[in-house]
Amino acid sequence: MKKYLEVQENNTKDTVLCEMIRFQTDRGLDKKDFNIDDELLNIIEEMLEAKGVRDKDNREFSKIVLDSFNSFVSYVSMYEKDYYSEPTDHTEVDAFCDIVEYATGGILKKGYNPVIALDEMAKEINSRIGTFRNGKFTKDKSIEAQAKWYKANFTKARLQN
């Protein structure tokens, strides 16, 4: 399996990362001010989806989870000071890198090549057009737009045992 991953990574890893960055830059997302809660809201929405909870329209479920999370952090910062330090750029970037690392592990444990899976996801995301509303991308669901949608084929990423 290691050899298989090395071959695949050498062929596509730069392309996959570039496609993920392109999604952000084409839509001007990289120009928005950084807001940790907005970023965490996106991650929470995906975590809920992984558990079967759909929260696509108004993000209310994600907001409830984020509010609970923030209440916990506030409690720790006030009453458990030994376990809290003010976040820095370094700790935030480190945390996001760790999230990517754990997500990569999850994809591998499910039996998929993360590079190919991410490539498929990038193709799907970049095939969509739409608008942003409240910080969330809303797909154009017109017949013309749907005709251009690519559906990720994760079977291409399935690892051979």
Q: Where do the PLM segments sit?
A:
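Flexible "arm" and connector segments at domain edges
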Residues: M1-F96, V100-N161
